[in-house]
Curated annotation (Swiss-Prot):
PANTHER family from the UniProt entry: CAMP-BINDING PROTEIN 1-RELATED, TELLURIUM RESISTANCE PROTEIN TERD
Organism listed in the record: Clostridium acetobutylicum
InterPro entries, per database record: Stress/Tellurium_Resist, TerD
Function as written in the Swiss-Prot or TrEMBL entry: Not known; could confer methyl methane sulfonate (MMS), mitomycin C (MC), and UV resistance.
Protein name per Swiss-Prot or TrEMBL: Chemical-damaging agent resistance protein B
Similarity comment: Belongs to the CAPAB/TerDEXZ family.
Length: 139
């Protein structure tokens, strides 16, 4: 569950109040090489009351445009060490989400004082609104 609306980082709230998480902006086209969107996280600044961070993707106005993630190719999430640009891990979404318009891709969570990564790949119909309801938010 999200503690409050300000903990939900997305295209209308790009930076967490702690400064620990910043979304560098929404790529509306997906054109070009390399990463389309970036989220910068400083784990040392994450408030102690936050034990889990979920990474999600949605398709804006997917219903109106008859779009879903089954139509998206080459989608992935990767974790990169910003100090040396080393890729620590990469999770490919695949094209198995034929009706989903929102996906919980992965999470990082605290375990015994360390941060761990968990690939999830759980899809939702209903886009951003359905995703928000899943985390206890109303849009």
């Amino acid at each position: 569950m999200v503690h409050n609306d300000l903990d939900f980082i997305f295209y209308n709230n790009l930076k967490h109040s702690s400064g620990a998480i910043e979304h560098l902006g929404d790529n509306l086209t997906g054109d070009g090489d390399x990463d389309d969107e970036e989220i910068i996280i400083d784990l040392s600044l994450i408030p102690q009351n936050i034990s889990r961070i979920n990474f999600t993707v949605t398709i804006h106005e997917a219903g109106e445009r008859s779009q879903n993630f089954g139509q998206v190719s080459n989608a992935y999430v990767r974790v990169v060490n910003s100090d040396n640009s080393q890729e620590l891990l990469k999770y490919d979404l695949g094209e198995d989400f034929s009706i989903e318009t929102a996906i919980v891709v992965a999470e990082i969570y605290r375990h015994n004082g360390e941060w761990k990564f968990n690939a999830i790949g759980s899809g939702f119909q209903g886009g951003l609104a359905a995703l928000c309801r899943n985390f206890g938010l109303n849009v």
